C-alpha cells in the first residue's frame, strides 16, 4: 500500500458535509491507492447533527474504520503519559495517533487541531490542518 490518509473528527465531519477540500483530498488519495482510515471512536466524535444517516453509512463503508482495541489504548496511554496530557481531553486523539504511528507509511492526518496531533503522532506522520 502506498500510504495512509487518516481522518480525525473534523476531517470526517467535513467529509460527511461534502467540504470540497476534504472531498478532493480523499478522492485523490483513493485514486492513488492510499488507504483512507479513521478510528471507531472518531466516528462517534464526528458531527452527526445535520447529516443523513444514509450518508454517514455510505462514507463509512468507504473508509477503513479501525477498532480501538486494548493494544491501541495501551499505546495511546503511553503517548498521553509521555506528553503529560490528560486522557479526558486527549484520549480520542491519542488513539488516532497510536493508529497513525503503526499505519502503512507515508501517513497523513487531516485535523482541525494540528498542534495536539503533531505532538502525539511524532515526526514520521504529516499532520494537515483542514
Regions found by a protein language model. Give the residues of each.
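Histidine- and aromatic-rich ligand-binding microenvironments
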Residues: 7-8, 38-39, 89-90, 125-130
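A general structural signal for well-ordered alpha-helical segments in protein cores
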Residues: 22-23, 43, 53-56, 73-76, ...
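Short, hinge-like loop/turn segments at secondary-structure boundaries
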Residues: 53-57, 83, 126-128
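A generic structural signal for short hydrophobic patches within well-formed alpha-helices
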Residues: 12-13, 43, 73, 117
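Short, well-structured N-terminal submotif of metal-dependent ribonuclease cores
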Residues: 1-38, 48-61
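Acidic, PIN/NYN-like endoribonuclease modules and their adjacent C-terminal/linker elements
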Residues: 2-4, 25, 101-130
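Structural recognition of alpha->loop->beta junctions
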Residues: 59-64, 122
Amino acid at each position: 500500500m502506498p500510504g495512509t490518509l487518516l481522518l480525525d473528527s473534523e476531517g470526517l465531519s467535513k467529509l460527511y458535509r461534502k467540504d470540497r477540500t476534504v472531498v478532493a483530498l480523499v478522492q485523490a488519495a483513493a485514486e492513488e491507492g492510499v488507504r483512507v482510515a479513521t478510528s471507531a471512536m472518531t466516528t462517534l466524535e464526528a458531527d452527526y447533527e445535520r447529516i443523513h444517516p444514509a450518508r454517514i453509512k455510505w462514507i463509512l463503508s468507504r473508509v477503513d474504520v479501525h477498532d480501538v482495541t486494548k493494544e491501541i489504548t495501551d499505546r495511546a496511554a503511553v503517548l498521553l503519559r509521555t506528553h503529560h496530557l490528560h486522557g479526558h481531553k486527549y484520549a480520542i486523539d491519542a488513539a488516532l495517533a497510536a493508529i497513525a504511528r503503526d499505519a502503512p507509511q507515508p501517513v497523513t492526518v487531516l485535523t482541525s487541531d494540528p498542534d495536539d496531533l503533531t505532538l502525539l503522532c511524532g515526526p514520521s506522520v504529516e499532520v494537515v490542518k483542514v
